């Protein structure tokens, strides 16, 4: 229930920060059974009851270090879950074994790329800067609004019952969301007004006409021809002068809202949803409220010290690293040439079977909670029980109809499936399930051999397969160079127990 509530909270907050509020939280009776985080955790009370003691999490196991980065075993396991899964069902070569050691070295290389990117000024890129600043504001604003909602918004069972009487076609959950929306919108509007007063917000109305004129120039008379009928981010970046960007539209304690802030907010909105009255000062003022809303929540977050919170700072550092890695890899591969027609043709001729239609195996499957359950299901099938009956008793997916499986989707499990004959039941065997793996028992219904496809049908697929291989090779080589350049340590003795096909077994981690 807590997980469901937090999911809805995030949706609620993202809409609040854009001036649109739709909420869905727990009822007051549900709250009695929830442990909700506070904005500033109080010291834990002493108790002789061990069940009330705070959970002590084990220290993470560090499996590699490079610079000030530490790679934990959990991070490695998470990446293994990604790497073991096939990435394409259409164009597939031989299954490539994934080892914890190779994935760990890839992670080390990526950390080295992040270090190199920071050293060479990747964070100075204006597009990257704008993205990170936007994420910072969103995270800070989210926390303020989530704290306020948790502390102030409750919905009683009686209110839900009343809503269901007035709206007999809605479910109880839908009724709860309707009540919360009705109560939450005015509540948050009041909070927003309180923040404006707290931070002494003042509109600079004499500049609204200037903002309107800049908007009309960008929209109707772009400096360079564009195919789109709306204002682009690049126009705000390149076609608005430094002086125009700095025009102040509103002030508050510790900050101000400029034309650039106003235009940036506009460009965050999909064009069909952008206001149509920004050619007037009144339209400028109305839309300014949208920019101000985020600014007020962020100002409150900073007043509470949320921008100094270690968890927030770690999240921003991780976000920066992620974006630096993308940029470094993109810059390194931007001049990689596309394969020519002769290369694509030669590649296709050498690997025709990778681009064939099929082979495929039509299967009916019993996905099981664990190996013991799979063994029990197989024993009952071997004793002559009906497959559908056993599936109904044991499968995690009881209503899934038989479907075709492909070499690309099965990866390391394909050979065992292809060896089976129609009407044969095989297993227990592992298979890709949800975000990981699960044990299953499989009934093979039919087998269809591969059928070659003409080159014209797969030219683009072959071309991009070559390009992807070249890109991967280039980045692997670059990563090795950086690993040699930066000092690092790996602790292979700490990952000896990792089997990629075991760490992903159902149920998924965290469930």
Spell out what each predicted region is:
Residues 176-198, 460-492:
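A contiguous, mid-protein "functional segment" used to position or interact
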Residues 2-28:
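Sec-dependent N-terminal signal peptides
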Residues 97, 101, 134-147, 161, ...:
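Peptidyl-prolyl cis-trans isomerase
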């Amino acid at each position: 229930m807590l997980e469901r509530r937090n999911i809805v909270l995030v949706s609620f907050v993202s809409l609040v920060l854009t001036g649109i509020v739709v909420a869905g939280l727990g009822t007051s009776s549900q709250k009695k059974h929830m442990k909700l985080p506070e904005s500033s955790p109080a010291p834990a009370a002493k108790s002789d009851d061990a069940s009330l003691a705070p959970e002590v999490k084990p220290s993470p196991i560090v499996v590699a270090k490079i610079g000030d980065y530490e790679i934990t075993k959990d991070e490695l396991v998470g990446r293994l879950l990604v790497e073991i899964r096939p990435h394409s069902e259409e164009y597939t070569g031989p299954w490539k074994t994934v080892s914890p050691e190779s994935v760990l070295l890839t992670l080390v290389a990526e950390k080295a790329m992040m270090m190199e990117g920071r050293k060479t000024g990747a964070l100075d890129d204006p597009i990257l800067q704008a993205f990170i600043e936007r994420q910072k504001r969103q995270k800070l604003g989210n926390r303020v609004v989530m704290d306020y909602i948790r502390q102030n918004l409750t919905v009683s069972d009686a209110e839900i019952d009343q809503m269901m009487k007035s709206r007999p076609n809605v479910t109880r959950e839908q009724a709860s969301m309707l009540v919360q929306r009705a109560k939450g919108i005015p509540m948050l509007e009041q909070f927003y007004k309180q923040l404006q007063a707290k931070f002494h917000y003042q509109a600079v109305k004499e500049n609204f006409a200037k903002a309107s004129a800049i908007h009309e120039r960008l929209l109707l008379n772009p400096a360079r021809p564009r195919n789109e009928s709306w204002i682009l981010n690049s126009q705000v970046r390149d076609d608005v002068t430094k002086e125009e960007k700095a025009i102040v539209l509103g002030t508050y304690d510790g900050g101000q809202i400029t034309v650039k802030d106003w235009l940036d907010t506009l460009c965050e909105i999909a064009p069909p949803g952008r206001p149509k009255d920004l050619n007037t000062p009144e339209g400028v003022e109305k839309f300014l409220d949208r920019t101000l809303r985020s600014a007020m929540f962020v100002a409150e977050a900073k007043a509470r010290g949320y921008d100094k919170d270690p968890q927030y700072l770690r999240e921003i550092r991780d976000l920066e690293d992620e974006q630096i890695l993308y940029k470094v890899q993109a810059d390194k591969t931007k001049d990689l040439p596309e394969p020519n027609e002769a290369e694509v043709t030669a590649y296709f001729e050498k690997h025709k079977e990778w681009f064939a239609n099929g082979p495929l195996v039509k299967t009916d499957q019993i996905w099981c909670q664990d190996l013991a359950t799979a063994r029990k299901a197989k024993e009952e099938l071997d004793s002559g029980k009906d497959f559908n009956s056993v599936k109904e008793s044991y499968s995690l997916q009881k209503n899934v109809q038989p479907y075709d499986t492909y070499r690309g989707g099965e990866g390391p499990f394909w050979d065992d499936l292809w060896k089976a004959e129609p009407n044969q039941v095989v297993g227990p065997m592992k298979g890709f399930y949800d975000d990981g793996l699960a044990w299953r028992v499989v009934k093979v219904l039919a087998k269809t051999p591969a059928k070659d496809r003409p080159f014209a049908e797969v030219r683009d697929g072959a071309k991009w397969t070559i390009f992807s291989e070249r890109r991967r090779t280039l980045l692997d080589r670059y990563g090795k160079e950086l690993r040699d350049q930066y000092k690092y340590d790996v602790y292979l003795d700490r990952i000896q127990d990792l089997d990629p096909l075991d760490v992903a077994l159902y149920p998924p981690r965290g469930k």
